[in-house]
């Protein structure tokens, strides 16, 4: 029974020394097969031993031991199998991790070969013998030939070919991650930052800048494809018509610690765009925004692409040269494009002249323009595209030509496959391999890849493989030539770094001069006073809060009571005018004694209705609304007295904040006030003191009303004339004349006459009631005869009660919460909004811009000085070119 654990232990030791690799030969068994056979032997041996043990020992005294061992037998077997299973899983995981890289390479090669075979087979149907009319070597043939050579080398054990394959694999790995960090002193990234700073200072200056690589070429030269091959993404708009109508200032930033590929549009304040279809769409819209009548614009589009797979470069893509204007294009388009390109081709910019191999260099628009801007060819790099369209010997002669010599030479690239990639060719059986593509291209993209992104990535890989296979196949022709996109990238990195490095000292001198001028202006105009948009905003908010604090001290209970009392006085006058002053029996109130109890009851009920209408008119909401409006109006007055009056953004924010704070307590305050005045709706108890105050207030109120009526009547009389007004009034008072002609009187004159009659009657009534109030109405007993006094007393009680709760529920809450809420909303404002607010004032805008210019110049000068200090310890940089 002890044989099974011992054999398992021996087996584990043997398996531990067994190599876990995948054998390609069918005659060699894998470790899994050996392990399975050994496990079978273990089980058979253990079973045989157990049976033998039971048969040979039949003693009754040993039955308990036998039974216990039989029971433990499954446990031993199960434990052994579990240990073996765990070991198998461990070895399988080790084997999978060992072969993962190899499988990935095989998968990439298989997919590319399937694509090439599909293209070759489809080409056999449409072309003669599978060869294109352009004379290119079919990609599938190149890949197949390369694969056959590799297999033959492996069978023969040729060490030289193995070394070549290792070099190619190493090149592929180096291409996957850009090595900008290892190039020279890695100064390009810092100098591109300086260039970006200088562009912020003055983007239109041709002197205050560092060199860039300016890409020029005709529309069919493959200019856009060269840029996309450097970036590794398709993002530039293409089309049969001219789609590049504005310069594209492209900045590539190497981010070694990031797996994302993102795009920024700094001038549009759009950042971290991961969808390059969106980038392409935006570039198309920005270019198409240029009117057809203008065709091209000098306003650049600023685009920054960040990735671990791009070098640190600063490029400018210009509109392609044309030979003949189209019918829908302006006649001066050719001249406009030439003038725009000349602006960017000036020193110290590097010129990247793109020319197609199938076009004679004598007709190259790019070389012609570069020769005009750089006669000696010291700043020009020639790039020859579409080398696969010509014979290798001719391609070599183009790259090594002496007719059009350039100091930096020519670089040959192939940026496209012989035929465009069709989606149906992405899979072996006509279907897009979505799963495999996702595994390849979604790495580092956090799930952002889609079918279109996969297609773009596949195009770049296939293009790179095609270029690599072509130059490898024709290696003997391009021995002494500079070819491949990788070589172009390396050359651009070195040249740009050297050019920028050489331009640092003269640029530093210019920056110092500009800084001195800016500092002098800043001192003269603003006395070196530091001001930021945020500090300007906070200073104005502090002034606003101080004004609100003063308003809080002035706006106490008496102010609130006067506002509410004035409104209720007007309501009292409206009630009196409606229910009393139009009553024909008003004269009866002046008699010493009413004729009957019925008449007395009539005036008593009339007073109750008037009082009820006053108390049930919605005092809660009326008083709350009046208080709210008074606060908002005073807040507007405070804003108008500060510098915020010129800033609509902050004025709206302050007003909306105040409205929200007041609205939060509006309904609860109105309900509280309404509940407090509820007893006055049923019974109003007046003391003699209240009556006396109300009587005096009523007299003053009637006097003011009488004064206003007399003033208005006198104004009409002066405007029309006393005699003419008397005639009109006499005519209107005679009712029989209303049915006849107007005797030449205008409609306006008749309206003035009607108003004068009304005012005359109202003055007589007010004079009559004023005498009544002065001579009588001395006590509450006469409240039915003196409704003016009674209603005035009621309004006074309503006002006093409402003010108590308005002061507590609304005012105190507003003055406490408004500054807090205002600060909270101000913190939510972004830097862009704060800067926009500050620049609404022209003087402040000038202050901030001049100060920002001074700070940017200081920052650029500091960075340049640090690079120059470091550069002194580095000699012979230009010798690496």
Curated annotation (Swiss-Prot):
Outcome of mutating residue 223 to A:
Loss of stability
Signal peptide positions on this chain: none
Q: Name one GO molecular function term.
A: membrane bending activity
**What are the boundaries of the region G4 motif?**
385-388
Which portions of the sequence form the region G5 motif? 414-417
Q: Where is the GED domain?
A: 780-872
Q: What is this protein called?
A: Dynamin-like GTPase MGM1, mitochondrial
- Native organism is Saccharomyces cerevisiae (strain ATCC 204508 / S288c) (Baker's yeast)
């Amino acid at each position: 029974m002890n044989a099974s654990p011992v054999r398992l232990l021996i087996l584990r030791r043997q398996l531990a020394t067994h190599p876990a690799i995948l054998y390609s030969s069918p005659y060699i068994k894998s470790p899994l097969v050996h392990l399975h056979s050994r496990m079978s032997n273990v089980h058979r041996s253990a079973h045989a031993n157990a049976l033998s043990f039971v048969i040979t020992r039949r003693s009754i005294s040993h039955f308990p031991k036998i039974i216990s061992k039989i029971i433990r037998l499954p446990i031993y077997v199960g434990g052994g199998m579990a240990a073996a299973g765990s070991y198998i899983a461990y070895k399988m995981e080790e084997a999978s991790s060992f072969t993962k890289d190899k499988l990935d390479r095989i998968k990439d090669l298989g997919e590319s070969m399937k694509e090439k075979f599909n293209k070759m087979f489809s080409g056999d149907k449409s072309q003669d013998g599978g060869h294109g009319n352009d004379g290119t070597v079919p990609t599938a043939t190149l890949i197949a030939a390369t694969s056959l050579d590799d297999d033959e080398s492996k069978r023969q054990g040729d060490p030289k070919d193995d070394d070549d394959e290792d070099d190619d694999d190493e090149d592929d790995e180096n291409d996957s991650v850009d090595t900008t960090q290892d190039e020279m002193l890695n100064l390009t990234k810092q100098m591109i930052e300086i260039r970006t700073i200088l562009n912020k200072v003055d983007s239109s200056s041709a002197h205050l800048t560092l060199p860039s690589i300016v890409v020029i070429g005709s529309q069919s030269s493959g200019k856009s494809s060269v840029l996309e091959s450097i970036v590794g993404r398709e993002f530039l708009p293409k089309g049969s018509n001219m789609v590049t109508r504005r310069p594209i200032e492209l900045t590539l930033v190497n981010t070694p610690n990031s797996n994302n590929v993102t795009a920024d549009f700094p001038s549009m304040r759009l950042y971290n765009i991961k969808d390059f279809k969106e980038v392409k769409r935006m570039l198309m819209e920005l270019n198409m925004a240029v009117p057809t009548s203008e065709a091209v614009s000098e306003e650049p589009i600023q685009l920054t692409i960040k990735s671990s797979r791009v070098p640190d470069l600063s490029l400018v893509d210009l509109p392609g040269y044309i030979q003949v204007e189209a019918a829908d294009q302006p006649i001066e388009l050719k001249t406009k494009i030439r003038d725009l390109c000349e602006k960017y081709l000036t020193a110290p910019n590097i010129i990247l002249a793109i020319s197609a191999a199938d076009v004679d260099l004598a007709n190259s628009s790019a070389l012609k323009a570069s020769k005009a801007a750089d006669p000696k060819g010291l700043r020009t790099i020639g790039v020859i595209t579409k080398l696969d369209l010509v014979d290798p010997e001719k391609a070599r002669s183009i790259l090594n030509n002496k007719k059009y010599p350039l100091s930096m030479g020519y670089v040959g690239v192939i940026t496209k496959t012989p035929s465009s990639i069709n989606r149906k060719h992405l899979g072996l059986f006509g279907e897009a391999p979505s799963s495999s593509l996702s595994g390849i291209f979604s790495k580092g993209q956090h799930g952002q890849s889609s079918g279109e992104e996969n297609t773009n990535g596949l195009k770049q890989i296939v293009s790179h493989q095609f270029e690599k296979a072509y130059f490898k196949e024709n290696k003997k022709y391009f021995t002494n030539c500079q070819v491949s996109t990788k070589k172009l990238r390396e050359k651009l990195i070195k040249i740009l770094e050297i050019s920028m490095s050489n331009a640092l000292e003269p640029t530093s001198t210019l920056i110092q001069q500009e800084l001195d001028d800016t500092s002098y202006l800043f001192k003269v105009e603003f006395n070196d006073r530091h001001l930021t948009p945020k500090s300007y905003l906070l200073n104005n908010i502090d002034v606003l809060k101080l004004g609100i604090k003063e308003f809080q001290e002035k706006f106490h209970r008496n102010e609130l009571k006067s506002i509410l009392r004035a409104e209720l006085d007007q309501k009292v006058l409206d009630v009196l005018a409606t229910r009393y002053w139009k009553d024909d029996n008003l004269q009866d109130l002046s008699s010493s004694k009413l004729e009957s109890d019925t008449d007395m009851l009539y005036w008593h009920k009339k007073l109750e209705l008037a009082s009820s209408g006053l108390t049930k008119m919605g005092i809660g909401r009326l008083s709350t609304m009046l208080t709210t409006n008074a606060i908002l109006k005073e807040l507007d007055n405070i804003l108008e007295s500060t510098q915020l009056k010129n800033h609509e953004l902050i004025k709206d924010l302050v007003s909306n904040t105040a409205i929200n704070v007041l609205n939060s307590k509006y309904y609860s305050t109105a309900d509280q006030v309404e509940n407090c005045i509820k007893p006055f709706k049923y019974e109003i108890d007046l003391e003699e003191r209240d009556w006396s105050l109300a009587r005096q207030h009523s007299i003053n109120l009637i006097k003011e009303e009488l004064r206003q009526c007399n003033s208005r009547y006198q104004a009409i009389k002066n405007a029309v004339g006393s005699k003419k007004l008397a005639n009109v009034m006499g005519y209107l008072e005679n009712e029989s004349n209303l049915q006849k002609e107007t005797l030449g009187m205008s409609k306006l004159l008749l309206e003035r006459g009607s108003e004068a009659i009304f005012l005359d009657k109202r003055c007589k009534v007010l004079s009559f009631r004023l005498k009544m109030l002065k001579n009588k109405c001395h006590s509450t007993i006469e409240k039915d005869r003196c409704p003016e006094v009674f209603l005035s007393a009621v309004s006074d009680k309503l006002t006093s009660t409402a003010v108590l709760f308005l002061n507590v529920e609304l005012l105190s809450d507003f003055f406490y919460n408004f500054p807090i809420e205002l600060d909270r909303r101000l913190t939510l404002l972004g830097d862009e909004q704060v800067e926009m607010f500050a620049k609404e004032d022209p003087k402040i805008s000038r202050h901030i811009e001049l100060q920002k210019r001074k700070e940017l110049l200081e920052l650029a000068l500091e960075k340049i000085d640090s690079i120059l200090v470091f550069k002194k310890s580095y000699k012979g940089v230009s010798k690496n070119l």
